[in-house]
């Protein structure tokens, strides 16, 4: 078993502590992603000898793209070669309005700034397009780009499946959604970092708290709780190009440092089968 337990889930487990303690103690070994999850299970009576922290296997499956392939992604998305790009990925209702307002204000200062906006649920794309139009911001839907040329847009609405990961590869930095409004929980904060990109996220990242804390500590992540904080963080990174270049190398080291969970879990399974 490999897993993580958020504070929200832990509160539920504690209500029925005796039941979950008995349930989890049936497992031979519980491989947890972080100490917080291990300590949570121990607090409801799970035997510590059955608990082992091995890290997050997501670090072992992160994609990579060569510079040549990244250039092709940029061309495919019709993003101008000299544009600065930020991505707001896996956004939820209530987040797009804030992000678009921040982008519109920053566009006045940074004329070559492009936002790629990727709602988490594709069925929200039509609603998101209406929000963009209501704000008078020039945009194009990714699904409409197949037969269009040119770079005349401020926002690219990513309304297609399976492209967000490679889009992260061509941005300067990213905001990861489901973190700015309640109940939140956060989505995968590590995906942009795999491409050397620092990340912004809101205060509601319970599902990824351990990774969020590690990113903040390393300087690769910034938590923003208000629209003003988001704008200030984006403006800072747009203005500090040398810092972004430094963070790119740091991000790759961060990922390498956290890899190996899958191998550790495989070794544990192998030992159990032999024993």
Positions of the model-derived regions?
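Nucleotide-activated sugar donor-binding and catalytic core shared by glycosyltransferases
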Residues: 1-275
């Amino acid at each position: 078993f490999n897993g993580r337990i958020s504070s929200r889930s832990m509160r539920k487990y504690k209500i029925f502590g005796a039941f979950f303690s008995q349930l989890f103690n049936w497992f031979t070994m519980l491989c947890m992603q972080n100490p917080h999850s291990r300590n949570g299970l121990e607090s409801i009576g799970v035997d510590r000898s059955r608990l082992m922290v091995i890290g997050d296997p997501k670090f072992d499956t992160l994609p990579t793209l060569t510079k040549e392939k990244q250039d092709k992604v940029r061309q495919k998305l019709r993003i101008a070669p000299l544009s600065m790009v930020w991505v707001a990925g896996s956004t939820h209702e209530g987040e797009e309005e804030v992000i678009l307002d921040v982008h519109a204000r920053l566009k006045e200062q940074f004329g070559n700034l492009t936002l790629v906006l990727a709602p988490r649920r594709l069925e929200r794309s039509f609603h998101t397009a209406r929000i963009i139009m209501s704000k008078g911001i020039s945009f194009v839907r990714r699904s409409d780009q197949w037969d269009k040329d040119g770079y005349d847009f401020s926002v690219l609405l990513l309304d297609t499946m399976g492209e967000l990961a490679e889009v992260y590869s061509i941005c300067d930095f990213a905001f990861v959604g489901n973190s700015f409004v309640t109940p939140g929980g956060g989505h995968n904060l590590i995906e942009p970092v795999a491409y050397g990109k620092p990340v912004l996220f809101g205060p509601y990242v319970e599902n990824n708290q351990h990774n969020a804390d590690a990113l903040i500590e390393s300087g690769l992540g910034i938590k923003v709780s208000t629209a003003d904080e988001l704008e200030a963080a984006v403006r800072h990174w747009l203005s500090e190009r040398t810092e972004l270049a430094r963070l790119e190398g740091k991000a790759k080291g961060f990922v390498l440092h956290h890899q190996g969970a899958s191998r550790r879990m495989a070794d544990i399974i192998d030992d159990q089968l032999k024993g």
